């Protein structure tokens, strides 16, 4: 079930370095929110903080609240592994397990959870591959290695793997940056379909992509190198691209910098 995300006064640090300052935003269920901004502005850092994935970096810490349907994911006794199961992540480059079969790639997370029933695993594999618009392309070669698929197919396989564990939210960190235009279009169409069932947050350097797929867009920027990134503005995507409220947003969208 898609869930709402509320971020309040979020500050992110890596050791003494203040990476992101004072971010507050809301992501509604069954919607797509895009984060845009120049390199190094903190948008991917914020994305990873939404499921505590940034904690794999030594000395990472946060201040503030990230709430999923009202429950702080940084609260006491909250298991980060459980958070990442509920809030899935799709990375910049497709990362299937290359020697593992297509079927086993999809159900790898379920196996880690202790699911062993073959009929259940097969059912989830088919449902997830259908959900990722990949089933018809691979149904006759499910036992072949996932690494043998094209780049676009591998990314959809990774999306199938993410949704197989029934998350409420999908985070996507530049999911099309390594793909050709045709594969990119397939992923964008898939994102539009997936938002019927999931809350989606995507980081993209492609502003046209943000305009095409998202319902709201947040623009991140930083004052100077070494300064923390900040959320400058977040609003309906149509408004951000047609009538932004901040000059910095307009300058970035119009290509004056970035």
Curated annotation (Swiss-Prot):
Function recorded in the entry: Part of the ABC transporter complex PstSACB involved in phosphate import. Responsible for energy coupling to the transport system.
Keyword annotations of the record: ATP-binding, Cell membrane, Membrane, Nucleotide-binding, Phosphate transport, Translocase, Transport
Alphabetical list of PANTHER family matching this protein: ABC TRANSPORTER I FAMILY MEMBER 17
InterPro entries in UniProt: AAA+_ATPase, ABC_transporter-like_ATP-bd, ABC_transporter-like_CS, P-loop_NTPase, PstB-like
Compartment(s) of residence: Cell membrane
Name of the featured protein: Phosphate import ATP-binding protein PstB
GO molecular function: ATP binding; ATP hydrolysis activity; ATPase-coupled phosphate ion transmembrane transporter activity
Subunit comment: The complex is composed of two ATP-binding proteins (PstB), two transmembrane proteins (PstC and PstA) and a solute-binding protein (PstS).
One GO biological process term: phosphate ion transmembrane transport
Source taxonomy: Bacteria, Bacillati, Actinomycetota, Actinomycetes, Mycobacteriales
